[in-house]
């Protein structure tokens, strides 16, 4: 193992690849691995597909076990309190081969959670709504979820902070923003909306991180967020007021509780655990 420790964690793959088994590229001088597997000083050709295939095929059972345990614990006790390796009964090297760090698990969770959350939010909203209203419903529900459950608040804040998870959020949200608000600013490109999402995501994160109190009620928080975000996307002022009135007329807490229940159920099915 002393030889392996000189390399990055990606070298600790079983069964090992050999230079002959990898198509193309020269082998690492210190181990019988293709140079592509070594990220710690080897300067041969880089074929990242070899690394990804090796990790996936060798580690699927461990990956499933890690996700099952960790997603459950994230929901039950929060992101920060969860000790991944100890709870999932895998070695540190196996965990690092698959996820590198705890934020890798978070990224897997976020990708599934966001897609299901928004799909559920749309169905809960009921009638066919104009796109700007759908955006308001989705963001209002997300913000309300963080007021209903402190562990969800922590997950969302970390998701908007950690690079891998936040990159996914920014990228996917920007696509949705372009579809929803592109007609309000037809001169803007998809890339422009990505840059705008960086700002609106910062506003979202700040509001999620600040719990409601007697002065900053949930209703006030939603009104402030929607006013700023919709104005930034050039939604006309009279339409903004109608959207805010629509959200104000919803029982947003009850709707969000239903979304949270459906989200937890979907997560339990996807990652095979019970809460």
Predicted features and spans:
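C-terminal peripheral helix-coil segments that are non-catalytic and often amphipathic
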Residues: 32, 36-50, 179, 183, ...
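Helix-turn-helix
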Residues: 73-104, 108
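Amphipathic alpha-helical packing segments from all-alpha helical-bundle domains
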Residues: 158-209, 216, 220-227
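Basic, helix-initiating cap at the start of DNA-binding domains
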Residues: 32, 38-77
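Alpha-helical structural segments
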Residues: 65-72, 104-126, 137, 141-142
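Short, positively charged and aromatic/hydrophobic N-terminal segments
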Residues: 12-13, 39
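Charged/polar low-complexity intrinsically disordered segments
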Residues: 3, 9, 26, 36, ...
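Helical hydrophobic small-molecule/effector-binding pocket
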Residues: 132-157, 162-171
